[in-house]
Amino acid sequence: MKKKAVILLSGGPDSTTVLEIVSKTDYEIYALSFNYHRRNSLEVQKIQGLIKDYNVKQHRVINIDLQSFIGSALTDDNIDVPKFQNTDQLPSDIPVTYVPARNTIFLSYALGVAEVIGARDIFIGVHTNDYTNYPDCRPEYIKSFEAMANLATRVGVNGEKITIHAPLINMTKEQIIKKGLELGVDYSKTISCYDPTEDGLSCGQCLSCIARLDAFKKNNVQDPIKYV
């Protein structure tokens, strides 16, 4: 009987690379995505086409309201998504695109799903470039959540260890794209943009777009998605 894995899938290149990695193993895959604001609704649409390329047992989209977490450009319509010209301009601290407790909320849902379906493995696509800007992407956070998961669940208390896997955690964005290209990831079906147009074009200037474009450039590969 195959082991089951829950994968947090955003529709971006990082989580898609994780999906590719896990798809080459013997896991039965349960993908979990979140629709939490109009600015990420395009991600959810992209995922519908993306997962057709993979043997995903089940894909769940969870609708949650994070708009009460004001102060983030990704959940508050009154805050503009900051734009940049190059990587030198990117913030070195926690940016306004940080969403309070986002990964904690997402991983908590994943943990609940894992218990229900009998999975003991949860995968998330955090990486080294996230550390500076997003504290809930750091290795110590992932380890702490895993420890909590094993203290606060029936399966954990019964001695069946739950593992939070972050296979990209020691990789840069450049290395992730390189790895994905080697594995055959179709990045044309992914999106990174924090502020896409209504017709699905990426802005090319938000933190996420700049980081993505830089990663493809360093791999001497043209980013296959369309920009404004």
UniProtKB/Swiss-Prot annotation:
It holds the Pfam family QueC. GO terms for biological process: queuosine biosynthetic process. One of its GO terms (molecular function) is ligase activity, forming carbon-nitrogen bonds. Zn(2+) binds at residues 193, 203, 206, 209. It comes from the Bacteria. Its cofactor is Zn(2+). SUPFAM superfamilies: Adenine nucleotide alpha hydrolases-like. Keywords: ATP-binding, Ligase, Metal-binding, Nucleotide-binding, Queuosine biosynthesis, Zinc. ATP binds at residues 9-19. Disulfide bonds: none annotated. Binds 1 zinc ion per subunit. The keyword ATP-binding applies. Catalyzes the ATP-dependent conversion of 7-carboxy-7-deazaguanine (CDG) to 7-cyano-7-deazaguanine (preQ(0)). This is 7-cyano-7-deazaguanine synthase. It comes from Rickettsia conorii (strain ATCC VR-613 / Malish 7). The lineage of its organism: Bacteria, Pseudomonadati, Pseudomonadota, Alphaproteobacteria, Rickettsiales.
